Amino acid sequence: MDVDRQSIQRYIYLADDDSDDRDFFADAMLEIDPHVILKQAHDGMYLMDNLLRLSNSELPEFIFLDINMPRKSGLECLEEIRNHNGTLKEVNVIMLSTSSDPENIQKAMELGATFYAVKPSSFEKLKSLLDDILNMNLVSTFQEKRKFLFV
């Protein structure tokens, strides 16, 4: 773990309808940064209801969204987040999905996702992916569209 990370309290939100995937993510995040505050949503509607109640100072640094969720998909959440009038639209939104369908990737990019990653198949790969995301300069990565997809 980086020394700098110990002094930074990170707040992250994960929306995924699969409880096993949420647990997998939480365990990986805990190993990467035991000080992270991770909030979880079981679907997009629950996520948006909670995000819209937060003050600007309570907004997460990152929102990780699964694409295929009941009631409101990750892409619908992304669109709502980016169309929000407040600072919510400035939050880093990472699409984390099993889908590597070019149409989903293109749609996420068009809607303003900060990054798109295909869910890794192993715990170690997930830890590596999350560590990379937490440490990268997302503004410059987003500006360089060729780095948009991380598989």
What role is predicted for each listed range?
Residues M1-Y13, S19-P34, S122-V151:
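Non-catalytic signal-transmission and effector/linker regions of two-component phosphorelay proteins
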Residues A15-D16, F25, A41, I63:
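Conserved sequence signature across two-component system core domains
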